[in-house]
From Swiss-Prot:
Name of the protein in question: Immunoglobulin lambda variable 3-16
Gene name of this polypeptide: IGLV3-16
Cystine connections: 41-106
Organism superkingdom: Eukaryota
Natural source organism: Homo sapiens
Residues making up the signal peptide according to the UniProt record: 1-19
Length: 115
């Protein structure tokens, strides 16, 4: 049985000079191929801001996989989905494939794009 580690670094973001917000992710998530992965991100700013999820593979630029909590950009497989509940947002990967092994980052931004 193959295990796919999904690395989830802690990410801290600032919104201008007014305030800083800390978003917390677990250090890692490992799942078997074909299983469902749920990656959470928590932070007090999340009820007031949208969550964005990026996937980054070694040696590559980050790729946006979810925006505005649950929207999926064109070209991103349907197995990627996002949800939000209070101070917690979740990236779900249904039927994890080997190519999904990557670092996943969450960040928050308001509707104007301010982080």
């Amino acid at each position: 049985m193959a295990w796919i580690p999904l690395l989830l670094p802690l990410l801290t973001l600032c919104t201008g000079s007014e305030a800083s917000y800390e978003l917390t992710q677990p250090p890692s998530v490992s799942v078997s191929l074909g299983q469902m992965a749920r990656i959470t991100c928590s932070g007090e700013a999340l009820p007031k801001k949208y969550a964005y999820w990026y996937q980054q593979k070694p040696g590559q630029f980050p790729v946006l996989v979810i925006y505005k909590d649950s929207e999926r950009p064109s070209g991103i497989p349907e197995r990627f989905s996002g949800s939000s509940s209070g101070t917690i947002v979740t990236l779900t990967i249904s039927g994890v494939q080997a190519e999904d092994e990557a670092d996943y980052y969450c960040l928050s931004a308001d509707s104007s794009g301010t982080y």
